């Protein structure tokens, strides 16, 4: 597909929505880009998990931990939303690599919150976001906090929230967090996410082995109804999706 075709597709989608469409596309062979609102912040939902994975691999390859280190699953870290660990019994002894794999391939929120707490918010900010100069990127919350803030859960589960809202999903689209105008949030800009992905492709996040390790996990992503969905069979895609609703 030619660059001009990609530009037309982006324009078509942008014309079909009243919301800004954020796009950052780069041909890594030629350096040619297609950009739309690429420097503006957007809420990431689960797409922010790639920055958590980046800090985990930095920490492991710095010798501060091993991906084979085991930590038990606890009830305290369980998060609502996507994944399977929330439904499993506490005490399950998982490696850091297990948590990372679940976080990335099925977007497990509990695995994410374990790693977010294990690594530390400030370390993710300092060692990844600030280090790469990602001025529009924030990874301030684990998944449980993100869901609580965006949806106003206040201790309720999704069924209670649904019933309290008259059988409808609550709207957060006009919230200040969704508009990315708050001091704390989980957000990124398309061009900044593209920068992270290009570093992985070129083997320049930590080193080639670490970059390839991250990509190998991302190639196993099971939410394949989006980016890979309309691509020809056999195309290998390393990616991470994110959704605030369905």
What do the PLM-derived regions correspond to, one by one?
Residues 78-115, 121:
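Conserved catalytic neighborhood of penicillin-recognizing serine enzymes
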Residues 132, 214-223, 234:
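Small-residue-rich helix-loop
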Residues 36-37, 95-99, 106-111, 143, ...:
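Flexible glycine/proline-enriched surface loops and loop-helix/loop-strand junctions
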Residues 31, 43-71, 193:
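Active-site SXXK
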Residues 17, 113-197, 205:
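Mid-domain, small-residue-enriched loop/turn segments at the edges of structured enzyme/sensor domains
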Residues 67-82, 119-120, 143-149, 217:
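Acidic helix-start/capping segments at beta-turn-to-alpha-helix junctions
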Residues 1-43:
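Beta-lactamase-like hydrolase cores
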Residues 225-246:
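Short, Gly/Ser/Thr-enriched beta-strand-loop segments that form substrate-interacting elements
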């Amino acid at each position: 597909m030619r660059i001009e075709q990609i530009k037309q597709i982006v324009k078509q989608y942008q014309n079909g929505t009243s919301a800004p469409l954020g796009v950052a596309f780069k041909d890594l062979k030629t350096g040619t880009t297609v950009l739309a609102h690429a420097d503006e912040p957007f809420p990431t939902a689960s797409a922010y998990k790639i920055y958590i994975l980046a800090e985990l691999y930095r920490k492991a390859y710095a010798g501060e931990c091993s991906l084979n280190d085991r930590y038990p699953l606890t009830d305290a870290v369980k998060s609502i939303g996507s994944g399977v660990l929330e439904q499993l019994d506490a005490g399950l002894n998982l490696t850091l690599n297990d948590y990372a794999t679940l976080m990335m391939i099925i977007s497990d929120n509990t695995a994410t919150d374990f790693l977010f707490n294990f690594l530390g918010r400030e370390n993710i900010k300092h060692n990844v976001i600030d280090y790469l100069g990602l001025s529009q990127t924030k990874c301030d919350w684990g998944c449980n906090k993100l869901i609580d803030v965006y949806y106003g859960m206040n201790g309720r589960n999704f069924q209670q929230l649904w019933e309290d809202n008259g059988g409808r999903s609550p709207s957060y689209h006009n919230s200040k967090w969704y508009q990315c105008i708050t001091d704390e949030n989980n957000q990124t800009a398309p061009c900044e996410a593209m920068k992270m992905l290009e570093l992985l492709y070129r083997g320049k996040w930590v080193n080639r082995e670490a970059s390839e390790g991250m990509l190998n996990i991302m190639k196993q992503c099971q939410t394949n109804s989006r980016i890979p969905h309309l691509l020809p069979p056999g195309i290998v895609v390393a990616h991470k999706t994110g959704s605030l609703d369905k």
